[in-house]
Amino acid sequence: MVFKMMYSEAILDYANSKKFRGKLDDATVIEEGKNISCGDEITLYLKVEDGVVKDAKFEGMGCVISQASASLMLERIIGERVEEIFSLIEEAEKMSRGENFDEGKLKNVTLMSDIKNYPARVKCFILAWKTLKEALKKISRP
């Protein structure tokens, strides 16, 4: 059932979490992303020093899936090298398409692995990841 995966307690907790919400005044890069088909919006703020994401926040509005995905993503990337993050984005994309992916790399992001079973919601999940990819392209090459 769609509601079991998408609205599990853990996913609701991530969607409602304030831990990664807000702006970063000292952000290295800011990127906006929108899902025009459903109205989800996100603005990512990344602080990158010496090729490592030191801090990250987001502002956004949208469904539980898009907001939980953004929180899980930021939890996963803080402390990682930009080069490794491009690889994480690729793994998240594979997961969303139902392809083989490295669960160990994605860690808690795998809470949303059932998204592959709900094609209409994949765009909601992937919005944060696509926005992250565009942000990182501004400061590095994949």
Curated annotation (Swiss-Prot):
Name of the protein described by the UniProt record: Iron-sulfur cluster assembly scaffold protein IscU
Which Pfam families does its entry note?
NifU_N
Kindly list the organism's lineage: Bacteria, Thermotogati, Thermotogota, Thermotogae, Thermotogales
Give the family per the record: Belongs to the NifU family.
- Family matches, as InterPro entries: NIF_FeS_clus_asmbl_NifU_N
- The source organism is Thermotoga maritima (strain ATCC 43589 / DSM 3109 / JCM 10099 / NBRC 100826 / MSB8)
What GO molecular function terms would the record report? 2 iron, 2 sulfur cluster binding; ferrous iron binding
The record's subunit annotation is:
Forms a heterotetramer with IscS; each subunit of the IscS dimer contacts an IscU monomer.
Record-linked PANTHER family:
IRON-SULFUR CLUSTER ASSEMBLY ENZYME NIFU HOMOLOG
Q: What does this protein do?
A: A scaffold on which IscS assembles Fe-S clusters. Subsequently gives the nascent cluster to other proteins. It is likely that Fe-S cluster coordination is flexible as the role of this complex is to build and then hand off Fe-S clusters.
Q: Which GO terms describe its cellular component?
A: cytoplasm
| Gene3D superfamilies, per the entry | 3.90.1010.10
**CDD domains reported for this sequence:** IscU_like
